[in-house]
Curated annotation (Swiss-Prot):
The keyword DNA repair does not apply. Pfam families: Nitro_FeMo-Co. GO terms for biological process: nitrogen fixation. It comes from the Bacteria. The keyword Nucleotide-binding does not apply. This is Protein NifX. Keywords: Nitrogen fixation. CDD domains: NifX. SUPFAM superfamilies: Nitrogenase accessory factor-like. It comes from Herbaspirillum seropedicae. NCBIfam families: nifX. InterPro entries: Di-Nase_FeMo-co_biosynth (IPR003731), DiNase_FeMo-co_biosyn_sf (IPR036105), NifX (IPR013480), NifX-like (IPR034169), NifX/NifY_domain (IPR051840).
């Protein structure tokens, strides 16, 4: 997967994960996904980080243990794009401060990144601003507040 402009040195990247079978589109249920593609994203570009691949029986079977390695693989991500996600999977993703986003239909990963990048250039929605702060230390200087 391509780089999209040089990596900025001062800006902190936001990591975004995509549930995918074929590594091109978001078309997979989180629990059944064979792959989770991870990208870093800035307002002026993005880059591919890595693909986490999963083997074995990934079909719906009520076995929640198969979610643990997936959660571990994306724990540094702020956003997870999926075609679908079960209730317990969504709860575990949210508990790890990852915002799940369900796409209405299969959508190319690079198209989603382009759209998300444009949103970051403007005024992102509150949920996205919060997601962008994942992994950043929150410092409050009470002396500056009046």
């Amino acid at each position: 997967m391509p780089w999209r402009w040089p990596r900025p040195f001062k800006e902190k990247a936001m990591k975004v994960a995509f549930a995918t079978q074929e590594l091109q589109r978001v078309e997979a249920h989180f629990g059944w996904a064979k792959n989770l593609a991870v990208f870093e994203l800035w307002p002026n570009g993005y880059s591919f980080v890595q693909t986490h691949s999963f083997d074995g029986d990934l079909k719906e079977d009520g076995d929640e243990d198969k979610l643990a390695p997936k959660i571990e693989a994306i724990k540094e991500c702020a956003i997870l794009y999926v075609a679908a996600i079960g209730g317990s999977g969504a709860a575990r993703v949210v508990a790890n401060r990852i915002h799940p986003v369900k796409v209405a239909q299969a959508e190319p990963i690079l198209d989603i990144l382009d759209k998300l990048q444009e949103v970051l250039k403007g005024t992102p929605a509150p949920w996205l601003r919060k997601a962008m702060q994942k992994g950043q230390e929150r410092v409050i200087n009470f002396e500056e507040e009046v």
